[in-house]
Amino acid sequence: MPYRISRQAYAETYGPTTGDRIRLADTELILEVEKDFTTYGDEVKFGGGKVIRDGMGQSQTSRAGGAVDTVITNALILDWWGIVKADIGLKDGRIVGIGKAGNPDIQEGVTIVIGPGTEAIAGEGHILTAGGIDTHIHFICPQQIETALASGVTTLMGGGTGPATGTNATTCTPGAFHIGRMLQAAEGLPVNLGFFGKGNASTPEALEEQVRAGACGLKLHEDWGTTPAAIDACLSVADQMDVQVCIHTDTLNEAGFVEDTIAAIKGRTIHTFHTEGAGGGHAPDIIKICGEANVLPSSTNPTRPYTRNTLEEHLDMLMVCHHLDPKIPEDVAFAESRIRRETIAAEDILHDLGAFSIIASDSQAMGRVGEVITRTFQTAHKMKVQRGALPEDSSRNDNHRLKRYIAKVTINPAIAHGISSQVGSVETGKLADLVLWKPGFFGIRPQLVVKGGSIVWAQMGDANASIPTPGPVHGRPMFAAFGKALAPSCLTFMSDAAMNDNIQSKLGLKRTCIAVENTREVGKSALKLNSALPNMSVDPQTYEVFADGELLTCEPAEVLPLAQRYLLL
């Protein structure tokens, strides 16, 4: 006779199953399990007296015979494509199976074979996501990498050379020399990395040189002069060499207005940074560019979400980052023109509608590198509280909203930058960059981070203790972050032209280098669950934002989840 246990006892032993609901941390966001790939009564679990033992859940199959290197058991996957319970198999640093793990000699329906060479990670009671992707990094200091990793971000793309004045303001690694040095520095950093060259030039030669030197994209920034001529030249080189172009448009409207920038883009694919405008861009109406089909619009996290403190902290941040002088009235006026409560409030709603598609940090240049995922789900929480359930959701769960928001920090930045064949989702064939979260800490503090199939970061107690759990428990780098294990666990992204020019060998790089691809063929319609194209307008006097004729406005949050309850500040 089969043995029956209560739903609560089952969840406590094997994790939640189909129909179970979970609150994410201290938010109002509720997740419901859509499908369970494991088999009731035949689940695999590691431990004394448990299932993964020789002749039981562990087969005799060798690694060469098909057994996986690692199995993550009974994890609850949250990704853009679904919310499912499954075992996950990892081999050679890649995801090779999502389904039912075990011993096919005695168990039915096994799709992931456990053998003597298989390690086990207990996913029961944990949420599993793809590693986050942050595509707006100012590489000001290498300590950012550890902070990002501690938040669940495993891929960083951007520009910079360290705390140079140019890097403090712009995400550009200018010129072949600096690109080479940053690619060499990446060898010791335990995340995937890609670097943007400076895109501000009116003729192609210097831009092509940077792409051949190893840039994975080009960045147009107003502080270097984002003129229509520079926009056109940069996009022309990008189209020729298949790299993405990111743009920070002209706040002062010196070389033209938003309509002139749209005209200069000529319908070509472009990733617009901080599309609301507080981070920089045509004042006051750059936000309306999110209605263009060729534009991939992103936000940076200082305006995520709109709170009672958002406006107050922005002015000083902006003055420092852009090398402005508070004694010069024109500099102060420049800064103040970028900070508008109306457009920041509208940005919240545009994210909830799926009209803004990506969230990134703007690290140490107004944004916080360790808060990308936190700010994303704070925004989702605020929108549920203020706007209620999405039409696709119900009173039972917020599944569609959760998929929409997780896509903003995983698959969509990967698609935008031509790396989605490698990273950005929990799918077979992709690099095993995975994050395990306890539900009570979702979005704020990962329990464990897997990088290229090996554990790179984890919550860990006193190293001198008799067991791993005694305090102080905090996030620490693990073995995949050290020695020669680091290089095979990580990817460096660059242009196909650089790969063909053998930059990897010329610079002595040991990491796996991958060419970005298909960056010029994507439009907003390719971005998962975030492809809305509203007809946008902005009142030039009041700064009120309208989408399809509807005023977009909301109140600032007074209190947020994923905040002081979790932080000793």
UniProtKB/Swiss-Prot annotation:
Binding positions (Ni(2+) 1): H136, H138, K219, D362
InterPro entries assigned: Amidohydro-rel, Metal-dep_hydrolase_composite, Metal_Hydrolase, Urease_alpha_N_dom, Urease_alpha_subunit, Urease_AS, Urease_asu, Urease_asu_c
Post-translational modification: Carboxylation allows a single lysine to coordinate two nickel ions.
UniProt binding sites for Ni(2+) 2: K219, H248, H274
Keywords, sorted A to Z: Cytoplasm, Hydrolase, Metal-binding, Nickel
Listed pathway(s): Nitrogen metabolism; urea degradation; CO(2) and NH(3) from urea (urease route): step 1/1
GO MF, one annotated term: nickel cation binding
Record: active site: H322
Urease domain sequence ranges: 131-569
Localization: Cytoplasm
Catalytic activity annotation: urea + 2 H2O + H(+) = hydrogencarbonate + 2 NH4(+)
EC nos: 3.5.1.5
Main location: cytoplasm
Alphabetical list of NCBIfam families matching this protein: PRK13206.1, PRK13207.1, urease_alph
PANTHER family per the UniProt record, alphabetical: UREASE
Assembly, per entry: Heterotrimer of UreA (gamma), UreB (beta) and UreC (alpha) subunits. Three heterotrimers associate to form the active enzyme.
Name of the protein: Urease subunit alpha
Upper lineage: Bacteria, Bacillati, Cyanobacteriota, Cyanophyceae, Synechococcales
